[in-house]
Amino acid sequence: MTDVNPVAVVGIAAIMPMAPDADAFWANITGGRYCVTDVPPERWNPALYYSPDHSARDKTYSTIGSWVREFEWDPIRWKLPIPPTVSAQMDQGQRWALSAARRALMYAGWPKWTVDSDKVAVI
């Protein structure tokens, strides 16, 4: 490979369990915070999916995990072109991705930046 394209990371964001933003996530890491809990009842019912038998089909043998519980989602206030009916039907993962992308762009100076938007990407 001879072509090298430099990349500048100028904005960061994260939505993680017990960390609605990158700063809280870093604080959890540096503070050694344990972010694993029992499954919240709004996620799934352990009575339906749990089995202590590790070989049970269509079951899990664990009732713990890390769960995103808080993050900001306000597409109307953010003036995103997402109709409320579409927003209401979006998967939570899509909302997390859009919210984190928006926050990373803002961290980088958007919407007041003076860079060529064709050279901007969110990964």
Regions found by a protein language model. Name each.
Residues 1-87, 94, 98, 102-110:
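ACP-dependent fatty acid/polyketide chain-elongation machinery
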Residues 120-123:
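Extended hydrophobic secondary-structure segments that form protein cores and membrane-embedded regions
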